[in-house]
A protein has these predicted regions:
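Bacterial N-terminal signal peptides
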Residues: 2-12
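Sec/Tat signal peptide C-region and signal peptidase I cleavage site
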Residues: 13-17
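A cross-kingdom marker for long, charged
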Residues: 229, 236-281
Length: 281
């Protein structure tokens, strides 16, 4: 997905999914470490969670998110998105992933998917399982689209993530992080040229750019783990829409919450000194 689905998890977690892990850190703490670019410590938090809750898919899928975020940081993926217009995105080069990180990323996703499907056979309305599968498909879409430049595969995973998100919202309407998957899908496809939108709709993916922004706003305001990521994606969208005040407000809030991440200070400076149109020099 163009803006990263990612990522990549809501207020609807079951009690098991938000328990404190053995070292006193929760999944919330793990995500805070990710947004502050402390990938090694986040990995340890997610491993601890898996040891405490071996049947819960959330630990593994969160670990996969950490691997993806680390690659985004190493390759400058999010930084590039702030000043890439749709034409330059289409012409982007395929990046060179770290083979070891890629293998660990997919291994974590396979583990999460296996645990999630196992839980769904026992309870089709298992919220953690549906959440993990929503996130897993979104992470695959991000990796395929933003790192490997496999656009068709990315759209396939985007559709998959949206389907899981809709199932999750049917179980619990207050799983606000699930709106990240559907919002990104709506925004990206709604931003495409009309003939491409038509072809994508034939494949069963709907598109409404403004609805996508509204769903991202919902996650940004009321989401849990993914609320900060939704704010990042919204800031990117606002830059592309040339809405500098909103983009700057979001980036300031992110800078203040995650001071160890230089991206936010850097992008505020670019907003203040560079024109909104075109790519960064």
């Amino acid at each position: 997905m163009l803006l990263c689905a990612t990522l990549v998890l809501p207020l609807c977690l079951t009690a098991a999914a938000v328990d404190t892990v053995a070292n006193g850190a929760s999944l919330d703490h793990g995500f805070s470490l990710l947004y502050n670019l402390d990938f090694a410590r986040a990995h340890q938090v997610f491993l601890s969670f898996q040891k405490e809750h071996p049947d819960n898919p959330m630990g593994a899928v969160c670990d996969a998110a950490g691997f993806l975020f680390s690659e985004f940081n190493r390759l400058g993926v999010l930084e590039a998105q702030f000043y890439a217009d749709d034409q330059s995105f289409a012409a982007r080069k395929r990046l060179t992933p770290d083979a070891t990180i890629r293998d660990r990323f997919y291994a974590a996703l396979n583990e999460a998917d296996s645990r999630a499907h196992s839980r769904l056979t026992k309870n089709p309305k298992d919220r953690d399982a549906l959440l993990a599968l929503t996130m897993s498909s979104g992470l695959k879409a991000d990796y395929a689209g933003l790192i490997e430049k496999r656009n068709v595969a990315s759209l396939h995973y985007t559709k998959e993530a949206t389907a899981w998100a809709n199932q999750l919202l049917a179980v619990d309407r207050e799983c606000y992080d699930a709106h990240l998957a559907t919002g990104v899908s709506q925004y990206i496809i709604g931003s495409m040229a009309a003939p491409i939108r038509w072809l994508v709709r034939l494949g069963g993916i709907s598109a409404d750019k403004q609805k996508g922004i509204a769903e991202l706003q919902l996650t940004a305001e009321r989401g849990h783990y993914l609320a900060p990521f939704a704010r990042i994606l919204l800031a990117i969208a606002y830059v592309r829409e040339k809405d500098k005040p909103r983009a700057r407000t979001l980036l300031i809030s992110l800078r203040d919450e995650f001071p160890q991440n230089p991206l936010f200070t850097q992008e505020i400076a670019h907003l203040d000194t560079q024109p909104l149109s075109g790519n960064r020099p």
